[in-house]
């Protein structure tokens, strides 16, 4: 019985990781020069969109889940724009792409969307529930502080460990 449960768990995890696995396979397999004359970053965007459309079309993801994943993509893209900005320069996307905005290729948001897809899929497949959730105002406040720290840690200090302690504390 334990082996069967372990196998079921593994299959659900694999299923939850479907978008992540396919997208990162593309990241590793698409050559730096791109495919069929399409620059690499643009090819990655096409692959990510194709995977996402296929998952919705086959019913592996719902339209409501797609909306949440799009939110992860938008937030992630905004974070990438900040981290690659002229004042920060944490990293860069040096290769050419037709689908760059503010120096950031649109595919980059799918790295965050992949995490969102996994969370949403795992939540549904494992029928997860949160018990003893803190009041929404507390959750909202800690989320705002975490994002504020992300943007301001270069100027006022890094408070991520204090924020983690607050988020995990009782």
Q: Would you name each region that the model predicts?
A:
Residues 1-170:
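Aromatic-rich, lipid-facing transmembrane alpha helices and their immediate juxtamembrane interface loops
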């Amino acid at each position: 019985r334990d082996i069967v449960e372990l196998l079921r768990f593994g299959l659900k995890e694999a299923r939850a990781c479907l978008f992540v696995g396919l997208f990162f396979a593309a990241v590793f397999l698409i050559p730096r020069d791109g495919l069929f004359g399409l620059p690499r970053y643009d090819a990655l965007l096409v692959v990510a969109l194709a995977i996402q459309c296929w998952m919705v079309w086959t019913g592996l993801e719902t339209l409501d889940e797609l909306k949440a994943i799009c939110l992860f993509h938008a937030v992630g893209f905004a974070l990438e724009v900040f981290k690659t900005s002229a004042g920060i320069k944490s990293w860069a996307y040096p290769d050419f792409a037709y689908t760059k905005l503010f120096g950031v290729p649109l595919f980059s948001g799918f790295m965050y969307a992949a995490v969102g897809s996994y969370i949403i899929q795992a939540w549904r497949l494992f029928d997860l529930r949160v018990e003893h959730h803190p009041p929404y105002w507390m959750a909202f406040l800690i989320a705002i502080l975490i994002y504020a720290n992300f943007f301001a840690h270069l100027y006022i200090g890094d408070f991520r460990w204090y924020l983690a302690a607050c988020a995990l504390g009782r």
